[in-house]
């Protein structure tokens, strides 16, 4: 992320673990109504939402020109490419399982790589690139930036969360509205605004009072959506945006603690490696080792943390591993 904002480093690692809990629920506890409503469809939705805001803040807290944007996009592309290679065997296995021929698999892979992420959690990286570009283009027109991206966010939430659909041709090409244009651009724009007004974020009393109310509202919105559509998985809701903005604002405004580069890198690795860990844990059934959902969930969380620790530790000796963080 960048030095000098230790609070955000700590927040990012906590949110990465929250996202692991979300995906654990989707993998191993999919029949658990409590987990579905009170983790997956509510509090866990602030994870990636906050990532976008923090990324926008940290990028735009300094003057941003073409060279800096190019450098940032290249860094994200490199990270995206490295982890795409890691997950490529799983993608190939899925194509073989689904019976897709080689041309069909290539088209599907390229389409997902551009519009939806090469693996289900990788959408954040591809979306972040698009969101950064959108915000950079309008960075000197703050009112237009916020108005346009807020409109896109509203459309994105209504289509992805509330089930209002675009024409079928849109999804045939772009697959989803859970992307950098409709969801990421507004959040990165908010991060830029926080960077622009950072000096005014010291009066945190009102923010601290609003946060619990916003969290309650998040559970109300998520609970109501889940009640009317029990199978829907919420990615971002209106209240998760509000909670994320307040939470990141508070963490920026508080006195900053010192955090090492290792802490920053751990959160990235936890987020990017945990689906691979869960796939490995899930293979235990095929090996005749039958574990219940709770045990699989616990092992997945611990192994994700240990794997991240190992990768970060090895990166101090092998610089090539830096490409994965």
Region spans (language model):
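Alpha-helical transmembrane segments and their immediate juxtamembrane cytosolic regions
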Residues: 1-325
